[in-house]
Amino acid sequence: MSGEVETSLEISGSRRIQRSLDCGRNYKVRQATRTLFAHLIICHDGRPQSASMNMAIDEALLESASIPTIRFYRWRSAAVSFGYFGRFSDVASYAPERDLVRRWTGGGIVFHGNDLTYSTIIPASDPVFNQSSITIYQRIHHALADAFKGVGERAIVAGGGDPGGRGMRNGLSASGHNCFANPVRADVMIDGRKIAGAAQRRTRSGLLQQGSIQGISLKAGFAESFAEALSANCSDSDINEEILNRARELAQRKYGTESWLRKR
């Protein structure tokens, strides 16, 4: 993917450390001005992971989170993720140069490397879960656009077009296409270019939205600004061993298998 970007997940300042009940051991409370969520946990996954492990951690968080959570993460090596409904034949040519993985969410083909990748997990017990998938999708992207505006970028959330077909499960574009070459409704755009897209999966446990931001240089602390545009009450957290152990199991039995990769 052209336009790979530098990203930063740095956390600045010292804050009082408390005990987290969800995805990590320690978190630090801070306040912001906008609210989509009453409380949002920010999981900082500073260790680059394989493509299969990244997908597995997201699913493990969806299974266990009781508070809305946003996770920012990196990739161990250049990777390509493609949607649940995608065909393996559409991405096969990118191996072995890139790590390939089928997402549990829908959508098209996404090239990963230096992008800022995130997942938002909304447990079924949270009131936001009762909103429609497209409404949640748009509200998250409006918060992202606001974060860009806060650093002087003229970001907009695109209107019109198809939000993804097959409901929001198919994310932002046809499953066999490069997501960032095919902007559609609710994408985040700057100067006519798509710089952020995402895809969703809704289950009885909650809603998972996986997104990528690329094609633009991000300033240090941007990830925090994005999170704080989603909630007035953010809490920092690490991924705990229980989540990691469950993710390793999912990576071994599901995301890292040939049967999952070649499902279609």
Where would I find each of the regions flagged by the language model?
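Short coil-to-beta-strand
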Residues: G107-T120
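Active-site loop/lid in soluble adenylation, ligation, and acyl-transfer enzymes
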Residues: A32-A95, D99-R103, I109, S231-R264
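Short, conserved charged micro-motifs
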Residues: D90-A92, V128-Q131, L218-E224
